[in-house]
Amino acid sequence: MQQDGLSSVNQLGGLFVNGRPLPLDTRQQIVQLAIRGMRPCDISRSLKVSNGCVSKILGRYYRTGVLEPKGIGGSKPRLATPAVVARIAQLKDEYPALFAWEIQRQLCAEGLCTQDKAPSVSSINRVLRALQEDQRLHWTQLRSPAVLAPALPSPHSNCEAPRGPHPGTSHRNRTIFSPGQAEALEKEFQRGQYPDSVVRGKLAAATSLPEDTVRVWFSNRRAKWRRQEKLKWETQMPGASQDLMVPKDSPGIISAQQSPGSVPSAALPVLEQLNPSFCQLCWGAVPDRCSSDTTSQACLQPYWECHSLLPVASSSYMEFAWPCLTTHPVHHLIGGPGQAPSTYYLHWP
């Protein structure tokens, strides 16, 4: 029920203005009656104030001792004043393990703010996060590369219009090293390609460069060294990528059609150069036993019974990795009967 568009009547018949707190004299009466021992429901009926309103006023009074209403409308006053923020930062710096609610209690104990006007726990956490972001930004600025300069202009820069960066792309400035810095870095790289943190720290102090810049330089230098080594191998051995093709009738090759008893003597020097254990794995006997013409069929074992024990690799890879090794394609008993030979075996020359 509305009266004059301002006041309203509650269920008990009392008048109130919607959105406005109770007058101070009514609040004082509620507290006085509660001190005398009257129950909240009896106070509500006596003063014609809703039971919820009486309970909230008494609860706030018992908790904080404040009887006046909170701020009405307008902007909320800032509780985290500069003095409070400075004290929060000091407490967190002295005691990093403090929680936000402990900081709130300490602020109230020191008298910087009252119980009802202390910053909330979420507000204190917000202040702490902002302080951490400021510290991280400060350290990032301190650790940024000190020697940064734009790239050197080209000789034809006078006749060409300067080109700006493309929109939406960011370009990093290249670090220009002095001759002394480049010489010190290169000398340390020749000593070891993977320096530890102690060596990087000493090198950074000696060259007046940030440690991050030293670490990036070593990473780029290792990549450049790998490219140079790969180019050198390709230049020295242009045919390394091609598989070796050896005729079947060449010495040291035993064809699949030859019987074990008809092994030519030209094939035996290759086997004699191998370790006896290697020949034992492949042939079931050492070469001196298999070289006689009276060798029985039991003297030789098929390759597919012991192929898992032998090293297998392609010729191009092994020639690149170990130039001292030579590869020989084996055309006998590879992978079992009926399969084409395509595997190479290694032995020392």
From Swiss-Prot:
Specifically expressed in pancreatic islets. Residues 278-349 are annotated as: Transcription repression. Residues 83-131 are annotated as: RED subdomain. InterPro entries: HD (IPR001356), Homeobox_CS (IPR017970), Homeodomain-like_sf (IPR009057), PAIRED_DNA-bd_dom (IPR043182), Paired_dom (IPR001523), PAX_fam (IPR043565), WH-like_DNA-bd_sf (IPR036388). It is found in: Nucleus. CDD domains: homeodomain. GO terms for molecular function: DNA binding; DNA-binding transcription factor activity, RNA polymerase II-specific; DNA-binding transcription repressor activity, RNA polymerase II-specific; double-stranded DNA binding; RNA polymerase II cis-regulatory region sequence-specific DNA binding; sequence-specific double-stranded DNA binding. Residues 8-64 are annotated as: PAI subdomain. It holds the Pfam family PAX. GO terms for cellular component: nucleus. GO terms for biological process: brain development; circadian rhythm; forebrain development; negative regulation of apoptotic process; negative regulation of DNA-templated transcription; negative regulation of transcription by RNA polymerase II; positive regulation of epithelial cell differentiation; regulation of cell differentiation. Residues 5-131, 170-229 bind DNA. Its main location: nucleus. Keywords: Developmental protein, Differentiation, DNA-binding, Homeobox, Nucleus, Paired box, Repressor, Transcription, Transcription regulation. Belongs to the paired homeobox family. Plays an important role in the differentiation and development of pancreatic islet beta cells. Transcriptional repressor that competes with PAX6 in binding to a common element in the glucagon, insulin and somatostatin promoters. This is Paired box protein Pax-4. It comes from Rattus norvegicus. The gene is Pax4.
